[in-house]
């Protein structure tokens, strides 16, 4: 240990605060908190503790500097540690998945007819709104939202659509919504449905069942049979939900149970969420390289986890976390009610901790098995493509264009077989005019590799979505910049990046694989573009319609490598390629929508580029601009009454341009005149899922700015 570090250890204050450990390059590798900085930090270097952890044994070699921040209280230290971990993302700290991986249901109770909305857990909580969750998967929130909307009949349309709808949507026709947007619905009656939904989402189904049964009996006694039937359906749905839930505690309390399982530096923290005594959710959180004590890891985890979800009355933990009292104060302050951290040693609550620990162990085993399969897939890609090393950092690039217009490129990244969205990039093609995919790809790869040279980091493998021509364009870009695409025999440590082209499967000729050309009724041959053999027979064509396997083109090889169908290497590469295609298409559609928006607004006098962008940000769609009132238009940034009146008059003049519905706005509209429609419940469910998917759409990280 150098003299400067020894001096800092000697001068540490015996006060609460946070400490930042830095490596010799100045990067923060660990952030911790303490009620006494002197005692906590010195304990890592105390040979009398008998601590044999690998990280502590390497502290002398790893640690380059130490920084401390004194706080006024232990509670401030808890809050500061949370912020420092999010800011520096230290290597040895617990880091939860990105906040946008967690989703919640929001109910804005300030609205007279509130609805459930899907929101990211990281969004700032609004006063007067109630939140349920978080849900760790889109499928779980889909199931919950579908059931609530089906049986409690809350509206699904946005506030903007609610304010401007002229006729009820299909949900009204199939008795899934009372259509408060059009018809007069008693606020008290709707509020009753909201309260029922809240009780269901909070896990208080027992109270809800009793109340529903009483209201059903009352409606039947009053000869209101339709209302009684609706309440019966709600009651049956809630009772079916109760049958699926296991009661673990007789006291019906709300608590989370934390389990922890460790092997070496890797560990899993399991959270069992219990509401009204029933297990509602279970989430496993795996972490690597966690050399610090379990009590520090647990304290950091609880502070981060409950930042975006409400803490229950009790949190059962397997051991007392660092600064447990201050942590409980922070959680209570966030929640607005008291939160207790308990470490039971015997009884039913101790049994719950054992259940959580066994679940954590099971999650640990599943996590490591997944890691093994991922390592095997990377090794299989290395063997199949004759690579010089395992492709731990892979990127894939695709071009999207429409008749040469609005050409864009996309780049997606995978590290260790998992999406690395921080390195996703979007490119506007700048130097190519017309339809020239090869030149566009050359430009995109040139820009990517130029940035990589500036950063001093090259990926292991770049996959090009395309065949030999696209691969050659990318190789030419690498050659122009002097980027090696194979390891140097004389300098094996020199950086290089390998490139391959992944071509999609296609219809091919041949008796064993089917034929790409089919014969019609008059003997005319045509390209086969039919979905399946049944469609071919219906249209009078004869074809087996088999597809070729996926093909990978390698530099310097004439024939492509044909990957085994359903193999791990094909699945990994196809997943990377499909993600690049999705990312490019999404960006291209966004640009088309913006261009269409701008072109219509160009006809409005007095509306410049700045106000066009403000309208797009505020409303998001031309249809919503057209439906807006002058008062709503005047609320847009940079707009006054005069500009608002000009826009409103433009869209409401007799020869106004027709505007197509350019995005979903909740459920589909009912037939004119309120008559029945042919929309099925499946179509309605799809509309609801479309709204969820839109809310859960990945936010494109770090887009490449256009010139």
Swiss-Prot record:
Where do the segments described as Disordered lie? 655-707
Q: Which residues cross the membrane?
A: none
Disulfide cysteine pairs (residue numbers): none
* Listed Low complexity bias regions: 660-689
Among CDD domains, the record links this protein to: GIY-YIG_UvrC_Cho (cd10434)
Spell out the Acidic residues composition-biased ranges: 690-707
Q: Any idea where this protein resides?
A: Cytoplasm
| Top-level taxon of the source organism | Bacteria
Of the GO CC terms on this record, one is: cytoplasm
| One BP annotation, GO | SOS response
Which SMART domains does this one have? GIYc (SM00465), HhH1 (SM00278)
Matching Gene3D superfamilies, A to Z? 5' to 3' exonuclease, C-terminal subdomain, GIY-YIG endonuclease, UVR domain, UvrC, RNAse H endonuclease domain
Q: Name one GO molecular function term.
A: excinuclease ABC activity
PANTHER family in the record, alphabetically?
A: UVRABC SYSTEM PROTEIN C, UVRC/OXIDOREDUCTASE
Sequence similarity: Belongs to the UvrC family.
Q: How does it assemble?
A: Interacts with UvrB in an incision complex.
Summarizing the function annotation, the protein's role is: The UvrABC repair system catalyzes the recognition and processing of DNA lesions. UvrC both incises the 5' and 3' sides of the lesion. The N-terminal half is responsible for the 3' incision and the C-terminal half is responsible for the 5' incision.
HAMAP family the UniProt entry points to: UvrC (MF_00203)
Q: What is this protein called?
A: UvrABC system protein C
Species of the source = Anaeromyxobacter sp. (strain K)
Per the UniProt record, the lineage of the source organism begins with: Bacteria, Pseudomonadati, Myxococcota, Myxococcia, Myxococcales
């Amino acid at each position: 240990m150098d003299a400067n570090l020894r001096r800092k250890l000697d001068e540490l204050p015996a006060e609460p605060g946070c400490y930042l450990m830095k490596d010799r390059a100045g990067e923060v590798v660990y952030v911790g908190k303490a009620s006494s900085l002197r005692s906590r930090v010195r304990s890592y270097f105390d040979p009398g503790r008998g601590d044999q952890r690998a990280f502590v044994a390497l502290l002398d070699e790893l640690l380059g500097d130490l920084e401390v921040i004194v706080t006024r209280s232990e509670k401030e230290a808890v809050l500061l540690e949370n912020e420092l971990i999010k800011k520096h993302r230290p290597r040895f700290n617990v880091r939860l998945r990105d906040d946008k991986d967690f989703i919640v249901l929001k109910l804005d109770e300030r609205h007279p007819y509130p609805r459930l909305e899907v929101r990211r857990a990281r969004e700032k909580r609004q006063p007067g709104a109630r939140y349920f969750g978080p849900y760790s998967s889109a499928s779980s929130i889909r199931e919950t939202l579908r059931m609530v909307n089906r049986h409690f009949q809350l509206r699904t349309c946005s506030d903007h659509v609610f304010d401007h709808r002229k006729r009820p949507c299909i949900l009204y026709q199939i008795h899934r919504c009372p259509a408060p947007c059009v018809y007069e619905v008693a606020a008290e009656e709707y509020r009753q449905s909201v309260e029922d939904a809240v009780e269901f989402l909070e896990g208080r189904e027992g109270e809800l069942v009793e109340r529903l049964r009483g209201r059903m009996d009352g409606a039947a006694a009053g000869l209101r049979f339709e209302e009684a039937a609706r309440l019966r359906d709600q009651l049956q749905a809630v009772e079916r939900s109760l049958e699926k839930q296991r009661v673990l505690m007789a006291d019906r309390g709300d608590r989370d149970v934390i389990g922890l399982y460790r092997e070496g530096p890797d560990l899993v923290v399991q959270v069992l969420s219990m509401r009204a005594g029933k297990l509602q959710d279970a989430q496993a959180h795996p972490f690597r390289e966690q050399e610090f004590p379990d009590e520090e890891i647990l304290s950091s985890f609880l502070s981060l986890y409950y930042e975006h979800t409400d803490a229950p009355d009790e949190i059962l933990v397997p051991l007392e976390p660092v600064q447990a009292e201050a942590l409980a104060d922070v959680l209570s302050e966030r929640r607005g009610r008291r939160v207790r951290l308990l470490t039971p040693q015997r009884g039913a609550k101790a049994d719950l901790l054992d259940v959580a620990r066994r679940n954590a162990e099971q999650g640990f085993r599943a996590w490591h098995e997944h890691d093994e399969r991922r390592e095997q897939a990377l090794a299989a890609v290395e063997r199949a493509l004759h690579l010089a090393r395992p492709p731990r950092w892979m990127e894939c690039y695709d071009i999207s264009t429409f008749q040469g217009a609005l050409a864009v490129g996309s780049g997606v990244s995978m590290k260790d077989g998992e999406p690395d969205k921080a390195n996703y990039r979007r490119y506007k093609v700048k130097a190519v005019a017309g339809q020239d995919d090869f030149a566009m790809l050359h430009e995109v790869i040139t820009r990517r590799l130029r940035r990589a040279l500036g950063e001093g980091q090259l990926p292991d493998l770049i996959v090009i979505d395309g065949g030999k021509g696209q691969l050659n364009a990318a190789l030419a870009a690498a050659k122009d910049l002097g980027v090696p695409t194979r390891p140097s025999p004389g300098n094996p440590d020199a950086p290089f990046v390998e490139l391959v082209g992944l071509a999609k499967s296609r219809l091919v000729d041949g008796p064993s694989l089917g034929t790409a050309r089919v014969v019609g009724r008059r003997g005319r041959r045509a390209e086969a573009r039919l979905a399946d053999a049944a469609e071919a027979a219906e249209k009078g064509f004869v074809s087996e319609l088999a597809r070729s396997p996926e093909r990978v083109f390698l530099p310097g090889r004439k024939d492509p490598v044909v990957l085994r169908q359903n193999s791990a290497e094909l699945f990994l590469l196809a997943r990377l390629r499909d993600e690049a295609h999705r990312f490019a298409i999404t960006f291209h559609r966004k640009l088309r929508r913006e261009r269409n928006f701008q072109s219509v607004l160009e006809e409005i006098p007095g509306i410049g580029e700045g106000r066009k962008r403000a309208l797009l940000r505020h409303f998001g769609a031309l249809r919503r601009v057209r439906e807006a009132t002058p008062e709503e238009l005047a609320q847009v940034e940079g707009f006054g009454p005069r500009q608002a009146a000009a826009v409103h008059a433009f869209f409401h003049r007799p020869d106004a341009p027709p505007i197509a519905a350019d995005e979903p706005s909740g459920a589909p509209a009912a037939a004119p005149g309120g008559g029945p429609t042919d929309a099925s419940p499946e179509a309605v469910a799809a509309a609801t899922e479309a709204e969820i998917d839109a809310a859960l759409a990945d936010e494109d990280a770090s887009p490449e700015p256009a010139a």
